[in-house]
Amino acid sequence: MGVVVVGGGNAGIEAAVAAAGICGDVTLITLNRRRIGELSCNPAVGGVAKGTLVRELASLGGAMARSADGAELQFRMLNVSKGPAVWGPRKQQDLQLYMTLQRSELESAGVRVMEAEVLALEGPADRVTGVRTRDGLVAADAVVIAAGTFLGGRLYRGRERWSGGRVGDAAANALERHLVDRMFHVERFKTGTPARLVASTLRTDAMRVQEEDGPGYSFSGRPGDFRQAGERRTCWITFTTEETCRAAEEGMDSSPLFEGSIGGRGPRYCPSFEDKVRRFPERKSHRIFVEPMGAEGRLVYPSGLSTSLSRRTQMRMLRTVPGLERAEVARFGYAVEYGWLQRGEFDRTLRARGVENLFFAGQVCGTSGYEEAAALGLLAGANAARVAAGLQPRRPRRMRSYLGVMVDDLVGKGTREPYRLFSSRSENRLHLRQDNAPVRMGPLRRELFGRLPPWQQRWCEDLSRTEEIMRRARSGGKSLAELARRPDADASGLARICPELEAVPRDVLETAVLDRKYSGYIRRARSRSRQMERMESVRLDGIGDYMEIDLITIEARQALNRSRPRTLGEAARMPSVRHSDLEGLMIHLFGRCST
């Protein structure tokens, strides 16, 4: 019977491709076959932390990295004014080509695609046997729900209200009701998108060109291996004016966000324009990135103008922005409110609470963004296939990957707003870099899929060989490994000192140098990691009801009963659990073991 994946967005595609790599029998069910793989909001992949996550996806065999490389219109490395540890690769995308490449990934993996609405899960409370659609039952050994904004989706624009996952597509309302009936705790979040503008109606001479860093960077393999063959496209920057803010303020009377129609909380770091006007009244100007949506250059995406205000107000706003005064609107902006599952409804393998073969992925887990959704999709799909094959699911480690950080945050801490990944969320960010993802993710890839591809195996071997050369070769009485720690040391300088390093691929040598440069910080982070790992070895499975443990606070007891952490380490990362609560748990466990 295999694995059934519900949803055809980034999470669903990654789940299906990952599952197919293990069990080979995968069905992806979507409401609209023609819109599989569509990037519903901004036309770009990557960014600070997000780009590193895409590199991690690539090192786990993910589809997004390959498609993003193939559909690239422009490349920029963000955060280069800071250290390499927090650089963020970002690629502008040709949306139509990206969709085509994502569909090709499904075809290459042998995934069956079915167009239908999933109404409910079949099977007893602790195990699903398939999904029920309007056309009948689809049997499955495991199921992944990756419904995105379609789960109970409702759209808003001014006083317009209608059901949908995005403009032009229906919502999965029956599935949301079914999850509630199965006693899952479904909450509501909100997100939004700006108008799409006709590029030929813009005055680009009134805007500033945003220069790119040029082609040649690869998400999906070694950076030097990638050659962009497609057309390049320009991005522009403009700014709103006081008149733009005034137009938005005067249109607030019909705002679903402020008149109470939308109850779900939106993303803090990607607010709507009207939200920015209300939250930052002192700001009279906001930056807008005007981004192409395809190689043909017909439409552009004004990033920073996300809004659910009325059509009339949106037109008034556009008329006040330099370069957009005569813009023709292809589709007006809108907001979408949708269902998601609270902390405690899934564990660190993304398996549903109390259901051995049901997994969740993407925005239904509380995230925001293509990259976060895709990464969760890969993990959920691989684990669903492992369970279907009679194997144990795996979980990523917080100290080894941004995927691990995200999963640990969602399960251990939870979120009160759509979760976005940042480098600041990781205490080990000097190690979790985009350049070393192939070696960092190697162990998890072996755990999930049992093998590394040849390119990744070579990369890891090259890095090991380079580190050995740097330890052995000396200059001025010091090893190259020691010299690499100097602030002015770089890969080119070391290669000049040691000709043997000239034969090493440049990206591998740069990673080896950065590892040495950050080695002191990385050692301290690993020491903290070992402390956490010792706590991870203390199991909590034997504790039935935390309310019976008088040694810990009521708040901690309630939180522990909700989340059911497997280890003391997981409990330590919960926001409601204090150090004194951990001591109480240890005393309780020691007393129980000694009797």
What is the meaning of each model-derived region?
Residues N32-R34, R177-M315, G412-L480, R485-P487:
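An anion/pyrophosphate-binding glycine-rich loop and adjacent beta-alpha core
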Residues F289, Y301-T367, R394-D408, P505-A559, ...:
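A glycine-rich dinucleotide-binding beta-alpha-beta segment and adjacent secondary-structure elements
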Residues E122-L137:
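Conserved beta-strand-loop-beta-strand element in the redox core of flavoprotein oxidoreductases
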Residues M1-A11:
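Beta1/beta-strand and adjacent pyrophosphate-binding region of the FAD-binding site
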Residues V17-A120, A146-R166, A170, A174-E176, ...:
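Conserved N-terminal/central alpha/beta ligand/cofactor-binding core
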Residues A373-R394:
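Internal hydrophobic alpha-helix adjacent to the cofactor/substrate pocket in enzyme cavities
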Residues V6, V138-G148:
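Short hydrophobic core segments
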Residues R425, H431-R433, A437-P438, G442-T595:
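Extended, charge-enriched "interface" segments that sit outside catalytic cores
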